[in-house]
């Protein structure tokens, strides 16, 4: 087989032939990879010693695109990349040296989305019958953003034609389920060590000014499922720190937290989950898919943020005690 680099160049050429005028090949090469397989599909990186009960997750920053997926798509790579939380994994990478485990996906969100239920599937996009247990009626499915997405960006259809149910189930078995098994193990490992754990699920959002005249968004959005996925001190600590950095912060609007926040957060057992949505204008050029000059500043502020969370007294995070105690 040809090297990954030559294979990727061949795919770019093929895709540009199919979509003349595409800017598929006009992005810096180090920003995205095209491979025939994921090696590895995701990473869980742990420090030599944890300095607190806090870990970070970046499920939507993957930018390794399977060649067969690109050829099956009717969209160019730049359009597909609009669904990426670009460089969020790089923003949190330095936290490992500060004593915090991180997890990051390498596969793209538009290929399989781990921030969904395992079988949120849209019957309109598949050839064949879906399993009876598939959730075909969720709001996310209705919007084309199920476990295997039908659309990206402004409701742009990803595929030229229907894909097989078997292909969707393959992605779920090979990527979705192993990702969650690994994330759960990492979360529970921290919980066993400290008696509690805080999972910060990191995402990014368009600034609202990249493609059209939209109202500017907050700098950061804290999502705690309206106070159900973590104890109040977690969200309060995040908000206080972020406002101290000078950022405009909102809570649960417009993002209250997705499947990961809801599924992993269980404060009654000492498991706390919170979603952190970062405005892309804070750290990148959204049109060119490049880091901006403020990237390092934000990465440093996230290190301070992690330290503040780690300073929360464990007694405030551990499982609720009976009133008699």
Residue locations for each model-derived region?
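Intrinsic disorder/low-complexity segments
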Residues: 1-2
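Compositionally biased, intrinsically disordered low-complexity segments enriched in Pro/Arg/Gln/His
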Residues: 11-12
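N-terminal catalytic or cofactor-binding beta/alpha core of small enzyme domains
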Residues: 27-199, 204-325
